[in-house]
Amino acid sequence: MEKITGKNNDIIKGVKKLFTSSKERRAQGLFVLEGARLVFDVLNSFYEVETFLITESANERYFEQSVLMQKKSKASYFISDTLSQKLSETKNAQGVFAVCKMKSDNINLQKGKKYIATDNLQDPGNLGTVIRTAEALG
């Protein structure tokens, strides 16, 4: 993997721009994940990984997941701890970042209709509660 050390690198500038600008995220159709758990959860998802960035120390800590992520991503880079701190939106950077492609769900919603959206319901009984509440509210 190639190592990026300078903050003026185009890849680093692009990731920082995605972090700070929702307009840029929508325009490019990309978003950034930060932190080991979020980034490595992508391994079990349908999201496409454009770029994977990791510090050498984080690579040692999460070696197995890092190898899998390098295979899943289109481009992978080592970054310095200093760059990781500069990129990070958190106080204590974990040194793991991924730039992923947004999914565009073209749902044909009809005006005047009512819809319920749920995500990751863990208890089937909760769906019944949601439906009953929606019915009660009209």
Q: Which role does the model predict for each range below?
A:
Residues 1-65:
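Boundary-proximal intrinsically disordered activation/regulatory segments immediately upstream
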Residues 57, 101-105:
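Short loop segments at secondary-structure junctions
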Residues 69-101:
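Glycine/small-residue-rich loop that forms an oxyanion/phosphate-binding "nest" at active or ligand-binding sites
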